[in-house]
Amino acid sequence: LPILVMLFTSCGIDEEKADTNTKSESDTGKALFIRNGCAVCHGNAGRGDGPVASSLKPPPRDFRDRASYKKGRGVEAISETIKLGVAKSAMPAYPHIVPADRRLLALFIESLQSENSLDDNEE
């Protein structure tokens, strides 16, 4: 019984650590998003409303819209899109961003999908 109690107690600690790491990773990803110029097209909140967005055809993706992810909306798919870019769009390839940073960017972008859903109340 003491062993079971210890196992259950330690599991809770690991979950808290995982939540903190995910939040920290997302915050780092957001900083990378700004620093690498993603916000110029996608906007600071990833809504596709950056300063140059209106001049781009097709317009930049609104990361809240799950249907707009053409190559998948998971971390690996987003990371690969960052690396390779999107053909026939203004989205360039970013192969110079190291894989660990691309992953952090992808975690941030993925987090935008669940923060808000598109509805009639948002503009």
Language-model features, listed with the residues they occupy:
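Sec-dependent signal peptide recognition
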Residues: L1-P2
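C-terminal motif of bacterial Sec signal peptides marking the signal peptidase cleavage site
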Residues: L7-S10
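Detector for the c-type heme attachment site
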Residues: G12-I13, C41-G48, K83, E110-S111
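Electrostatic cytochrome c docking/interface patches
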Residues: G12-I34, K71, D119-E123
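Sequence/structural segment immediately N-terminal to covalent heme-attachment motifs in c-type
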Residues: K23-R47, A53
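Conserved loop-to-helix junction within protein kinase catalytic domains, corresponding to the end
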Residues: S54-L56, N121
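Extracytoplasmic electron-transfer domains, predominantly the class I c-type cytochrome c fold
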Residues: L56-E110
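Surface-exposed patches in mature extracellular/periplasmic domains of secreted proteins
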Residues: P92-P95, N116-N121
